[in-house]
């Protein structure tokens, strides 16, 4: 599985291919995202230049990359920051375009498509028309439960909201929960025993 970052780029704009420099290939909303607003989640900057994934030329560039990966033996893709790339009902055919090559695809969706506690289930289901998705909230529940010595109280966050189990991925921790500061570094002060037990339960679900 190859980790593909197609939502944004990092670094000097001068190093971007010349054909991708025109402004129509980029979102210009900027930062200050209202995380309960899906348009802002999919068009706002998360600290890096945000690619206009709804643009057909951008999609073709990514499709060419996917085909190149497949040609060298790659059979699966992890899509970084998938929640920041829209779905067809939002006017973005990116997922329909890039998943047509017979590879396994899953997207990193931290929390949910946005920060609304309800009302975003249809968007999550629409993602799963094309890719599998992560259920990071359930991973957090597993970690917290083992860390506190209590049993988990649910059988899965998104599965209980109607998302098919065969479209969900679980983990004990991720690079985000381990390496970030206290706002996101949920697991970096937990013992390895806690993480191992969380992974054991998560693996039994996958």
Regions from the PLM with identified roles:
Residues 1-4, 8, 60-61:
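Aromatic- and glycine-enriched glycan-recognition loops and surfaces
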Residues 7-9, 84-85:
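Short acidic, Gly/Ser-rich segments with clustered Asp/Glu that frequently serve as metal-coordination loops
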Residues 13-15, 55-56, 92:
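Serine-centered coil/turn micro-motif
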Residues 48-60:
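Active-site mouth loops of central-metabolism enzymes
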Residues 2, 63-206:
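Active-site-proximal helices and loops of the catalytic beta/alpha 8
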């Amino acid at each position: 599985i190859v980790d593909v970052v197609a939502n944004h780029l990092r670094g000097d704009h001068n190093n971007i291919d010349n054909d991708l420099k025109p402004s129509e290939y980029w979102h210009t909303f900027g930062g200050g995202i209202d995380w309960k607003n899906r348009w802002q989640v999919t068009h706002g900057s998360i600290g890096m230049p945000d690619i206009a994934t709804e643009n057909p030329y951008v999609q073709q560039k990514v499709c060419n990359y996917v085909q190149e990966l497949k040609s060298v033996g790659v059979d699966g893709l992890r899509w970084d920051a998938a929640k920041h790339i829209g779905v067809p009902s939002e006017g973005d055919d990116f997922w329909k375009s890039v998943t047509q090559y017979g590879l396994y695809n899953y997207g990193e969706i931290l929390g949910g498509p946005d920060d609304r506690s309800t009302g975003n289930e249809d968007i999550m289901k629409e993602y799963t028309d094309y890719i599998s998705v992560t259920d990071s909230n359930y991973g957090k529940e597993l970690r917290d439960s083992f860390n506190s010595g209590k049993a988990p109280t649910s059988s899965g966050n998104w599965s209980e909201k109607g998302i098919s189990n065969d479209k969900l991925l679980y983990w004990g921790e991720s690079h985000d929960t381990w390496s970030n500061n206290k706002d996101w570094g949920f697991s970096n002060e937990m013992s390895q025993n806690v993480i191992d037990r969380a992974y054991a339960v998560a693996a039994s679900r996958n």
